[in-house]
Amino acid sequence: MANFIKPYNDDPFVGHLATPITSSSITRAILKNLPAYRFGLTPLLRGLEIGLAHGYFLMGPFVKLGPLRNSDIALFSGFLSTIGLILILTLGLTIYGVAAFGQGQTTENSNDLQTKKAWDQFKGGFFVGACGSAGFALICLSSIPAFTIS
């Protein structure tokens, strides 16, 4: 097993161990396809895509595991809970943006999420995408018979 784990780039001072998982090309390909690392996306589209995923998968736990799961309004209360959590997450993104970027750092490349303007676009895309996908999940769960909640 010691032959598989070695220092990253044969430099023991980096502080990262290269394992077969962390240094494989498959892992790199999967990580490069995530919207946070994909090349050529604007901050708005990054936030939109990340928000779409989060809004959609946050709906299920609130509907199936929420305190009103056995009532007639389980779906609607799960939707409202999801929107509430999305608001809290967006507030957290806002606080991080104010703390990290403060006032007016401007650079020529606005696609790197390291400026206030780019972070605000990311945050807006996240909010719109998450609320939209939570609404889409609500429509799917309420109208498609295969997805009905019992």
Swiss-Prot record:
Highest taxon of the lineage: Eukaryota
Record membrane topology: Multi-pass membrane protein
Places the protein is found: Plastid, Chloroplast thylakoid membrane
GO CC terms in record: chloroplast thylakoid membrane; photosystem I reaction center
Transmembrane segments: 73-93, 124-144
Ranges facing Stromal side: 1-72, 145-150
Main location: plastid
This protein's UniProt keywords: Chloroplast, Membrane, Photosynthesis, Photosystem I, Plastid, Thylakoid, Transmembrane, Transmembrane helix
UniProt-listed InterPro entries: PSI_PsaL, PSI_PsaL_sf, PSI_suXI
Parts of the chain on the Lumenal side: 94-123
Coiled-coil regions listed: none
PANTHER family, sorted: PHOTOSYSTEM I REACTION CENTER SUBUNIT XI, CHLOROPLASTIC (PTHR34803:SF2)
Family: Belongs to the PsaL family.
Protein name: Photosystem I reaction center subunit XI
Natural source organism: Trieres chinensis (Marine centric diatom)
Gene: psaL
